[in-house]
């Protein structure tokens, strides 16, 4: 039964093509060549100005910038124009002020880091 259905599904289009040959008349080709008013470029946006929930979830799951791959948990030091870098991140070299702060931390624990 399955082979009969499959065979008929393959043979039926062949018979339809032979029975109804495609003939283009001058009127059909003229109407097909004319551009319609419906063929216009349309811009569709699914996000708002506040961002989407998927982006928020992605930022919580991967808390680093996709461009520079650094941590966004600590927002003290601004090295990347896209995202803040984490001073504890081993991938990023520390600026001179941050190095001095880590060296002086035992002497003056209330020192604030002003940025790089």
Curated annotation (Swiss-Prot):
Entry's localization field: Secreted
Pfam short name (any one): Defensin_propep
Main location: secreted
Signal peptide per UniProt: 1-19
Region described as 2 X 3 AA tandem repeats of C-R-X: 65-70
Alphabetical UniProt keywords: Antimicrobial, Defensin, Repeat, Secreted, Signal
Tissue-by-tissue expression: Small bowel.
Positions of Sequence repeats: 65-67, 68-70, 71-73, 74-76, 77-79, 80-82, 83-85, 86-88, 89-91
One GO location term (cellular component): extracellular space
GO biological-process terms attached to the record: defense response to bacterium
Region (3 X 3 AA tandem repeats of C-Q-X) location: 71-79
Residue numbers spanned by region 4 X 3 AA tandem repeats of C-P-X: 80-91
Domain of life: Eukaryota
InterPro entries with a match to the protein in the record: Alpha-defensin, Alpha-defensin_N
Keyword Isomerase: no
Chain positions listed as propeptide in the UniProt record: 20-60
Keyword hit for Translocase: no
Family stated for the protein in its record: Belongs to the alpha-defensin family.
Function: Apparent precursor of a secreted, cationic, proline- and cysteine-rich peptide that contains Cys-Pro-Xaa repeats. Unlike cryptdin, the proposed mature peptide region lacks the structural motif characteristic of defensins.
Protein name as annotated: Alpha-defensin 29
């Amino acid at each position: 039964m399955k082979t009969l259905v499959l065979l008929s599904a393959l043979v039926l289009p062949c018979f339809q093509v032979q029975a109804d040959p495609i003939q283009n008349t001058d009127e059909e080709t003229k109407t097909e060549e004319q551009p319609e008013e419906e063929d216009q470029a349309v811009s569709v946006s699914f996000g708002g100005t506040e961002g989407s929930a998927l982006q928020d979830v992605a930022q919580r799951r991967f808390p680093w910038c996709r461009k520079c791959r650094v941590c966004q948990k600590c927002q003290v030091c601004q090295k990347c124009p896209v995202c803040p870098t984490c001073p504890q991140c081993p991938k990023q070299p520390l600026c001179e002020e941050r190095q001095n702060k880590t060296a002086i931390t035992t002497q003056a624990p209330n020192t604030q880091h002003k940025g790089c």
